[in-house]
Amino acid sequence: MNNVISFIGNSSNKYFQINQLHFIRIINKNIHSKNNLINSNSSYNVFYNKYFIKNTFQNKNKLSSIYSKLNFSIKNMCKDKNEKKNYEHVNANEKNGYLASEKNELTKNKVEEHTYDYDYVVIGGGPGGMASAKEAAAHGARVLLFDYVKPSSQGTKWGIGGTCVNVGCVPKKLMHYAGHMGSIFKLDSKAYGWKFDNLKHDWKKLVTTVQSHIRSLNFSYMTGLRSSKVKYINGLAKLKDKNTVSYYLKGDLSKEETVTGKYILIATGCRPHIPDDVEGAKELSITSDDIFSLKKDPGKTLVVGASYVALECSGFLNSLGYDVTVAVRSIVLRGFDQQCAVKVKLYMEEQGVMFKNGILPKKLTKMDDKILVEFSDKTSELYDTVLYAIGRKGDIDGLNLESLNMNVNKSNNKIIADHLSCTNIPSIFAVGDVAENVPELAPVAIKAGEILARRLFKDSDEIMDYSYIPTSIYTPIEYGACGYSEEKAYELYGKSNVEVFLQEFNNLEISAVHRQKHIRAQKDEYDLDVSSTCLAKLVCLKNEDNRVIGFHYVGPNAGEVTQGMALALRLKVKKKDFDNCIGIHPTDAESFMNLFVTISSGLSYAAKGGCGGGKCG
């Protein structure tokens, strides 16, 4: 990577001997400035601003005297590994001997300007696509957004808004709330003085309520696009070339139309995966795409998978009163803190959810109105519903990416994009769940989409920060996390450099009624009370004065508790800051102000008493 930059007519001038590292720092500092787009066949588009290069040199007069003679020749650039991705970037290229740019004053020959139908064409009407489209329009871009929902294996479709609003976050939390309501009545209400004769749940009424709210959100999103001056087309889109998109209006394959765009964003998200090697699975099973609009009540249900989607769905179905079994290959919630994952699973077992550990379906057969499932342990059982939640794959089928030689991870159909949302095609970007190695969370897609739009259309040099992203899992006992798990911290920093503070305790409201285990989970007639319901855990770096790098909470309202803690972690909070903070009593969250037992001490971290996270025993 020597001779990174050469100059016409004055390559020996000492003011222009820029070493490779310093130049790349300049490029990285000002990456994605709208005014200077470097066309590239590399793994990402390099954007930079001549202002910063000009001011790098002490003698500005000598620089400006030959400024018009500059001819940049960048070779073998950016081979350093991207911090977010597990692949490398190569070669920002030349065009006719010059780096191409929109308003390039650094060369004698300006790049030819093209006329496009739109400045920004967005494929995908989920959170990331809509947010990026509206942000771009707010900065004067002409924006077109395509959205089309391909039916699930069971024929389920929905409106604009993507997975989150239609078949993800929104309906999931509503059904979680309905299930939690049922659990409170069934398990605790009598002890608190409530009397009722017949507690019965109406599945159809729940689905009607959920779907009605979703439709109202679909309408508000359409209104939002219109008011933002984003043109919307309900069309199945695919790429023709790096600046051309063809589409079929409302999926009608008999008529193909095309539009051109200066930049194209792919934000098509993911869809649930059903295995091909399980006979009858694709024909007879449903996924999370179907459960929230299921017309008949699910009845006795088998959930296949150990993902957070699997546990959330099995959790609210169990809480609604259905017989639920979960078939898992190995561990649950892979990638999350495993102590917390085990606690979530234990709570679910104590509430009556059955787990088949290391046992998976091998064959599904229709038996009248039920499904006969044959398992890998040679057993079989009848179920009313089988729901697969074993993972998701990028929704890229039909986008024609292969003809453009776009880099894609073929194992999960996700587009390989860097931390700047750039693909290996200069004018094409990817945000949200469809992008490789990006957290599958709606707020992440929204933020990445907005930042990308500002870089393209507002001269911004913002870069998406993927550190300390909070998340919450809406299982019967919720789990919120931000930062590193205990296992990941050990892997990155070494066990000797990590301290883990933790406390296990009982939620106040549950302690008061001595909530009991489901009969399935009772070992004998004396094994009645549930285990401690809550866990508070801080993962800290010893050599940085116990700076907190991991926050984990298992307990009620985990999402609400975790959100504020995420801000603290981003501000580099230390354990002593928690110690010096006064908690709100009696709450579960105050436990984080009272942590003093470490895993390395070997002492018991089970708190005595029953007043939540406070000191009461």
From Swiss-Prot:
Effect annotated for changing residue 169 to A: Loss of catalytic activity
UniProt-annotated stretches for the region Loop important for the interaction with TRX1: 514-528
Gene Ontology cellular component annotations, sorted alphabetically: cytoplasm; mitochondrion
EC number: 1.8.1.9
Cystine pairs: 164-169, 611-616
Pfam name, any one: Pyr_redox_dim
InterPro entries referenced in this protein's UniProt entry, alphabetically: FAD/NAD-bd_sf, FAD/NAD-binding_dom, FAD/NAD-linked_Rdtase_dimer_sf, GSHR/TRXR-like, Pyr_nucl-diS_OxRdtase_dimer, Pyr_OxRdtase_I_AS, Thioredoxin/glutathione_Rdtase
Note: In Plasmodium, the C-terminal redox center, which acts as the active site, is formed by two cysteines while in mammalian TRXR this redox center is composed of a cysteine-selenocysteine active site.
Recorded family membership: Belongs to the class-I pyridine nucleotide-disulfide oxidoreductase family.
Protein name: Thioredoxin reductase
Source organism of this protein record: Plasmodium falciparum (isolate 3D7)
